[in-house]
Amino acid sequence: HHAIMNVLEPVFEKQFIFHTYACRKGKGSHKAIKYAFCKAKNCEYFLKLDVKKYFENIDHNILKRKLSKILKDKDCLDLLFDIIDSFSIEKGLPIGNLTSQFFANLYLSELDHFVLEQLKPCGYCRYMDDFILFSNSKIDLKKMLNSIESFCLNNLLLTLKPYILGKCKDGIAFLGYKITCKDVDLLRISKKRKKQKLRRINYEFENYFISKAKYIERVKCLFSI
């Protein structure tokens, strides 16, 4: 899977907006948090959304159509389709596979473009299936919510978890941190998650799933902001 994505990553990159931060070189959760903090300082309201059981509900036919639009090599497509169907026939991707991370990121890229080009909030960022919109109008965000729910259901066959719409000054829980217009604090619950992630990184390194350089990079990323 790593060899496949080393070749295909540049092709996928061309589909992504600037402010989507998962599974991309030079991005990551901490840059997503910094962007959200910047917007929280300059916008009054936020709308936080999350896809319900995202990986489990990725539709294979829709994903394959998206891949067919950006890749023209039949052998390559056949290989990717086999990987997709190896988990189940109609929908769902295994969370642990590297290809699944890229497929999942690509699946929502159409939504990213819809939000930025059609809805035009004051700010927008996405980390996999967690995303935030910013605006100075609560009414505008409610309208955007309706549009996004319809887009996800009709175009992607996805539904959203209950939304959170609030004032930035009251704080935004995002990727294990509480972001306000003044500062960024680590959520208490995320300390336990950090330990779990560290154990996972150590396991992957000790069992030769990742290189030493990648191990160091991920540990630094985990404990820095």
Predicted regions mapped to residue ranges:
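Acidic (Asp/Glu) carboxylate-rich active-site/surface patches
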Residues: 28
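Short, well-ordered loop/turn and helix-capping segments at boundaries between secondary-structure elements
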Residues: 137, 154, 180-184
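Right-hand nucleic-acid polymerase module
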Residues: 2, 142, 159-225
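Conserved polymerase palm-domain catalytic core
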Residues: 18-19, 24, 33-34, 38-128, ...
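Active/ligand-binding-proximal structured segments within catalytic/core domains
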Residues: 3-8
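Charged boundary/loop elements
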Residues: 10, 14-19
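Hydrophobic recognition helices of helix-based DNA-binding modules
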Residues: 11-12, 115, 152
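A common structural junction motif
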Residues: 149-157
